[in-house]
Amino acid sequence: SLTIHVIPHLKDNKFHVVHPRYTGKYRYFRYLSPDWSRGNMAELYTFNAADDTLKHKRLMGNFHVRPWCGPENLFDGNVLSFYDSHDVYGVWYGWELEQPENVARIVFLPRNDDNFIREGEEYELFYWNHGTWMSLGRKTGNFEAVLKYDNVPAQALFRLHNRTKGSEERIFTYEDGKQIWW
């Protein structure tokens, strides 16, 4: 087997994109989970250079999974479903492609609670000002899971509201360019 990417660590809940450097054709694709991990992944897709999703003809791997947490969840389009093994060592899953293909892009989303910036969803950022929440405006989420606002007050207390479907909110500040949750 050929290792085409190693995930060093994940600090953000969002979709991640990998562009493999190897340009050959693959017949099999596999994700090998680190030890002490159950292979928790919500979504995992492979694409060719034309940006078509590569179709699988057979799933393979560790199927000693928790109920409703099988490999079919990896490409069901539901960010809340996920693969979850009973095992913690040597956990892997993959598939045989319908035909050998170049893999131009891999997109994956770790297991999450869907509490991150989502593409196409509307958000509104507020800051606390003398006893009331003031709006800094509405923005639409992008694939990179980044919202950019101008004229944001320094040393303020913020709250981001997902206007599309949000009900859980936490306040936060920025310190040295990093978001601090309270």
Residue spans of the language-model regions?
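Non-cytosolic beta-sandwich-type ligand-binding/adhesion modules
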Residues: 1-7, 109-145
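A broad, low-specificity signal marking well-ordered, structured residues that form hydrophobic/aromatic
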Residues: 29, 93-95, 123, 158
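Ser/Thr- and Asn-enriched, surface-exposed coil loops between beta-strands
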Residues: 12, 25-27, 89, 141-145, ...
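Residue-level detector of beta-strand structural context in well-folded domains
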Residues: 18, 93, 123, 145-147
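Noncatalytic modules at the cell exterior or secretory-pathway interfaces
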Residues: 21-34, 150-164
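Disordered, acidic Ser/Thr/Pro-rich linker "stalks" and the adjacent N-terminal cap
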Residues: 1-25, 36-103, 111-118, 163-182
